[in-house]
């Protein structure tokens, strides 16, 4: 048990003082008036600001490393950099690339998550940004690798990492996109609209499918 004291705590939309934070394990267990708890290791944060860690759900890389490197040391470097800047967990985000390259990246994320205890921000899973997007809104994605939404292709990509994808960016105006979104939702994957040329009406329809 650890007690964080003498900090400026962001709570209920405002910065507050005169409060202590009780930490049990890796979670905030309680927040009470200063001096409520007498037992436990007390850490004086000397007036620093205390706020919940950020969760970054869309990040391809940082500090010279990229998720598509498909290397655990790259993920370690990204995680360490994020933690040093207030982000405590993140979704490793892939780019539109060849199927083997996406598979390699997802496999590396899976191995990293199942491996030894790591320092830095925690990887919660993967965010697949593409390849099921609109080539007319490709941005930095490789146009030659963009493909229509397809359940079989997704299952091929994730055959060895079936539970690693937590979020999918999808262009809902593409053929079969809504059926594909229903399939992803049934698997517990959050679907987000992105890299799209969808109209307002198409977006409203997509929202009715849980996107």
Where are these regions (language model features)?
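N-terminal metal-binding scaffold of metallo-dependent hydrolase/deaminase domains
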Residues: 1-37
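Divalent metal-coordination and catalytic microenvironments
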Residues: 7, 21, 26, 47, ...
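Short amphipathic alpha-helices and their capping/turn segments at secondary-structure boundaries
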Residues: 40-41, 46, 105-120, 204-208
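N-terminal small/glycine-rich loop or linker at the start of catalytic domains
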Residues: 49-64, 127-139, 175-182
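Divalent metal-dependent hydrolysis catalytic cores, especially in the metallo-beta-lactamase
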Residues: 60, 76-105, 121-134, 161-173, ...
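Active-site mouth loops of central-metabolism enzymes
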Residues: 61-72, 140-147, 190-194
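Histidine/acidic residue-rich metal-binding segments in metalloenzymes
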Residues: 112, 147-211
């Amino acid at each position: 048990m650890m007690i964080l004291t003498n900090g400026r705590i962001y709570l209920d939309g405002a910065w507050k003082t005169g409060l202590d934070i009780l930490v049990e394990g890796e979670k905030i267990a309680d927040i009470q008036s200063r001096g409520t708890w007498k037992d436990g290791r007390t850490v004086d944060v000397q007036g620093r600001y205390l706020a919940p860690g950020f969760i970054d759900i869309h990040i391809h890389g940082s500090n010279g490393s990229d998720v598509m490197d498909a290397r655990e040391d790259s993920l370690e470097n990204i995680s360490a950099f994020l933690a040093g800047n207030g982000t405590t967990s993140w979704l490793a985000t892939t780019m539109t690339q060849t199927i083997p390259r996406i598979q390699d990246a997802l496999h590396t994320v899976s191995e990293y998550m199942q491996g030894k205890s790591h320092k830095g921000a925690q990887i919660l899973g993967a965010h697949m940004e593409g390849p099921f997007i609109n080539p007319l809104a490709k941005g930095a994605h490789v146009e030659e690798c963009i493909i229509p939404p397809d359940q079989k292709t997704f299952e091929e990509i994730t055959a060895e990492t079936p539970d690693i994808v937590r979020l999918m960016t999808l262009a809902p105006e593409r053929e079969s996109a809504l059926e594909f979104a229903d399939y992803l939702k049934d698997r517990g994957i959050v679907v987000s609209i992105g890299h799209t040329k969808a109209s307002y009406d198409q977006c409203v329809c997509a929202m009715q499918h849980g996107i």
